[in-house]
């Protein structure tokens, strides 16, 4: 009897084991079929640089490029500025929400994509002529401590954030960081000091304009105080001057778009760069030119720099005797031939787009010598 039971148990155990193994095999085959039908990632090839990267399913191409240290061109990362626009040579993508001015229906039909909001559905090949060398600096997440808050204008503060001593945060003048807010929201700001002028303790400088109703700036202007901790991630962006370039430079800023322009000027001065530089800073009224004295001092310290502030709507109380009008139109009046120049523009998207269009059409600026960082607020972004 015991032997019979033992045989039956052996048969049952064997059958159960076979069933389990069969289930595991079928599950593995099902997963393989699902993986083949719905791959977890796609291969994106970048031409003419002949670079490749793996893009996770449902991940925008640009985010994968940043993660891999591959330097695709970009600006806002929100589908608003069009700086990341490139041509899709092969494969298929779908776009997240974006502004028509960044990518029109005609451009999309012609094969152009915005890498900041394009997710691949197949392996793809794209054409991006501005791909620089991969990953010079690592993108880091870190806590920072508010070192100082200075009111520079009625609606502008200069914020200095102390960097943690255990992090080697490196960046180029002109690059930006993201504030990581509660709920995962982010706000981007450009550094206003060059990496050669961090001071002691090492700190980055940011210029914040108050946007009433803004998730971050309402808090920054009403409640932020020294020693508060803010989490950041960076550096991001490719708005930077290369020391190997030799052409005369036009720096074009509107409002707090002056921040990365200031950092670039500091970098040029510390390099001992002798290229002719013109700084045009456009604001609405005199109070908006919140670091006018700094710019005047820079002009005295740099023999190759000419500083031109421009007001679009000066008030009678301003007693303004300087230039008046749209800042990019003042540039065109002063420099009707820009065929041998480089232009670096930062500020409101409307100014950046107008400058890019008009300086090329009316002043002969080569398309590949216009470099831009268009500031986008939450109002400028398109939310899915």
Task: Give the location of each predicted region.
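Reductase modules of NAD(P)H-dependent flavoproteins
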Residues: 17-118, 124, 276-384
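Short, surface-exposed secondary-structure boundary micro-motifs
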Residues: 89-92, 129-131, 182, 235
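Short, structured interface segments
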Residues: 113-136, 228-230
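Ferredoxin-reductase
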Residues: 138-229, 247, 283-285, 310-314
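Short, conserved phosphate/pyrophosphate- and ester-handling motifs at nucleotide-, phospho-/glycolipid
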Residues: 174, 257, 348
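A short, basic/flexible loop-to-alpha-helix module at the beginning of a structural domain
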Residues: 234-245
């Amino acid at each position: 009897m015991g032997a019979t039971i033992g045989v039956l148990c052996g048969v049952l155990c064997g059958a159960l084991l076979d069933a389990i193994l069969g289930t595991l095999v079928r599950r593995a085959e099902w997963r393989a079929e699902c993986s083949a039908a719905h791959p977890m990632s796609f291969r994106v090839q970048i031409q003419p640089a002949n670079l490749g990267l793996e893009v996770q399913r449902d991940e925008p191409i640009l985010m994968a490029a940043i993660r891999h240290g591959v330097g695709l061109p970009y600006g806002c990362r929100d589908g608003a500025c069009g700086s990341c626009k490139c041509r899709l040579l092969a494969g298929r993508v779908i776009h997240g929400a974006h502004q028509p001015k960044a990518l029109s229906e005609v451009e999309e039909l012609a094969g152009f994509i915005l890498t900041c909001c394009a997710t691949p559905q197949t392996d793809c090949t794209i054409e991006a002529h501005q791909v620089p060398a991969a990953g010079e600096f690592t993108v880091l997440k870190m806590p920072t401590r508010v070192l100082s808050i200075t009111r520079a204008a009625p609606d502008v503060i200069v914020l200095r954030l102390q960097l943690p001593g255990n992090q080697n945060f490196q960046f180029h003048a002109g690059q930006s960081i993201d504030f990581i807010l509660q709920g995962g929201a982010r706000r981007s700001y450009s550094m206003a000091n060059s990496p050669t002028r961090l001071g002691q303790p090492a700190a980055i400088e940011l210029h914040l304009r108050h946007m009433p109703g803004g998730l971050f700036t309402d808090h920054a202007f009403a409640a932020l105080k020294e020693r508060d901790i803010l989490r950041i991630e960076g550096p991001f962006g490719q708005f930077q001057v290369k020391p190997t370039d030799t052409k005369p430079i036009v720096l074009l800023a509107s409002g707090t778009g002056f921040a990365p322009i200031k950092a670039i000027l500091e970098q040029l001065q510390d390099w001992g760069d002798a290229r002719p530089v013109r700084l045009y800073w456009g604001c609405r009224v005199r109070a908006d030119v919140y670091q006018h004295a700094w710019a005047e001092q820079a002009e005295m310290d740099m023999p190759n720099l000419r500083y031109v502030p421009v007001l679009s709507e000066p008030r009678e109380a301003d007693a303004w005797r300087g230039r008046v009008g749209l800042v990019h139109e003042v540039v065109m009046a002063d420099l009707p031939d820009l065929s041998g120049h480089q232009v670096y523009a930062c500020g409101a998207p409307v100014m950046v787009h107008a400058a890019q269009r008009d300086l090329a059409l009316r002043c002969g600026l080569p398309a590949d010598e216009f470099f831009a960082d268009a500031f986008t607020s939450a109002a400028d972004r398109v939310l899915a």
